[in-house]
Amino acid sequence: MNELEYVPVPAFEDNYIWLVSDGRDAIAVDPGEAAPVRRVLAERGWRLTAILLTHHHADHVGGVDALRNSQPDDAPLPVYGPAAEAIGVVTRPLAGGDRVTLDAPAVAFDVLDVPGHTRGHIAYFQTARQGAAGQGNAEPHVFCGDTLFSCGCGRLFEGTPAQMLASLDALAALPGDTRVHCAHEYTLSNIRFALACEPGNAALAAWRDDAQALRARGVPTLPTTIAHECAVNPFMRADSAAIHATLEAELHETVTDRLAAFTLMREWKNRFR
């Protein structure tokens, strides 16, 4: 059985469409544009076999129709996505607790409910490849859309702070070595805000230097890992006394608990420059 390859395909200004392939067949996660996906598929000689969607925003679903229309009539492309959102292109609606099992490539995902950015947002957690009895992946993977970014989280367009914090807690509970495939290259701007929240975080300062070096070479800062984000991401560190002290000093608000800290951080981030 071939190893799986995880390829970030740049789209728009800062999106990543993720392709997962065994060297022959591939699935696309959140294809907001069709052209970049088609280009990579053609360059590598891969066949697209399924699409996974995390939420309804146009920069995540806009390329689906074009990709489906380019498929042979005898090989319709299944499109998986959240049942709780009105996404017309979805043919296989999903909810948290469901499992997606694919044959080509042979891979399985557990579906996680992660509302906040949108009300019905889901994530896909890959634990083990189908048919590999007794064998797991070298590491797990999660495709989290716009819920979690490196050193950040998605804006709350539809959900509440409590929902988003619970969603981040659910992701934080995944194994620490889980590779986190975020949908945007926001890392450098997020690090600036994270350092404002927690200037004494040495791991965060080191990540700033590493991320700057990666971007200077045109290399993605993703995937990250759950353990790394728990060490550097202020939105996953809402119980940090250092962050609480910063929020009280900068915003002149009393931080009563981690939800209050998260809410203040998210509001601050919305206007941070």
Predicted regions and their residues:
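Active-site-adjacent loop/tail segments of enzyme domains
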Residues: 152-178
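Divalent metal-coordination and catalytic microenvironments
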Residues: 20, 30, 55, 67, ...
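Active-site environment of divalent metal-dependent phosphoester hydrolases
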Residues: 14, 35-36, 56-62, 86-89, ...
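Active-site neighborhood of phospho(di)ester-bond hydrolases with catalytic His/Asp-centered motifs
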Residues: 29, 49-57, 78-83, 113-116, ...
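Accessory terminal helices/loops
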Residues: 169-179, 188-273
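Conserved beta-strand hairpin/beta-sheet module of binuclear metal-dependent hydrolase folds
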Residues: 1-46, 124-129, 136-144
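Active-site metal-binding motif and surrounding structural segment of the metallo-beta-lactamase
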Residues: 34-81
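Core dinuclear metal-dependent hydrolase active-site scaffold
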Residues: 19, 99-136, 173
